[in-house]
Amino acid sequence: MVKILDCTTRDGGYADNWEYSDEYISSHLEFLKANNVSYCEIGYRNYLETEGKGRFYRCLSEVAKPFANIKNDLLIGVMTDVKRYNPEDFVGRNDDYIDFVRIAAHPDKIQAALEIAGDLYDKGYRVFVQLMDVSNIDADGYLYLYMWERKEILESLYFADSYSVLKPSEIAQYYNKFKILGYKNISFHAHNNQGYALENSLAAINLGAYSVDVTRNGVGRNGGNLDISDLLKSLN
């Protein structure tokens, strides 16, 4: 069964400026638990460009602390990327209140993102790498992915339709490519500018995707993300 990763307060932060009350987050986590969601990405943990943004854009350990006792089996995490990553912000899983980190890897930063993934795994975190703008990855990017010797440490390798250019018929070519490169778990992050978020995600699920991303009411950057209610209806 495919796992669900909710990123309402991370990707939805583009609409809400990453400012949420503890009460809202707690209520949201209860909703996710009730719907058998496996992962909640509650914000970014970014080091740069933080001025004027809410606390879930920085989302250091103390921001996540209030939710440690209510999440139960739900895994909580954050996203970072190569440009905004500060290793000192990640103190190690044993001293942190998040379970996983997802690293956004733009096509020209794949090698650096994989190195960060290794560092975070060695600190005890579960680690995802998300390949952004997947249709523009070049030969060097694919070579780095193929040659990387620590593929097995990833919870999953995500590919993202960052600019909502993919159609359902195109999902398989990327999914199968990453399988050939040697990645066991492959996941998909949709955007909905063209109205294909659900269809593209279902195409990935039918191929055997480890997880797909959702938000409540489809909130997210630009055209938004896959609405969790649409996915749950389709899976049921």
Tell where the protein language model's regions lie, with residue ranges.
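N-terminal small/glycine-rich loop or linker at the start of catalytic domains
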Residues: 1-17, 73, 96, 126-132, ...
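Short, small-residue-enriched loops and turns at beta-alpha junctions
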Residues: 11-16, 48-53, 83-87, 106-110, ...
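Catalytic alpha/beta core domains of metabolic enzymes, predominantly
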Residues: 156-236
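Glycine-enriched alpha-helix->loop->beta-strand junction motifs that scaffold or abut catalytic
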Residues: 36, 72-73, 95-100, 121-126, ...
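Catalytic cores of alpha/beta
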Residues: 86-94, 137-151, 195-209
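Core alpha/beta catalytic barrel or barrel-like domain that forms the active/cofactor pocket
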Residues: 2, 7, 42-43, 77-81, ...
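Glycine-rich anion/phosphate-binding loops
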Residues: 17-27, 105-112
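Active-site beta->alpha loop and helix N-cap motifs at the rims of alpha/beta catalytic domains
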Residues: 33, 39, 44-144
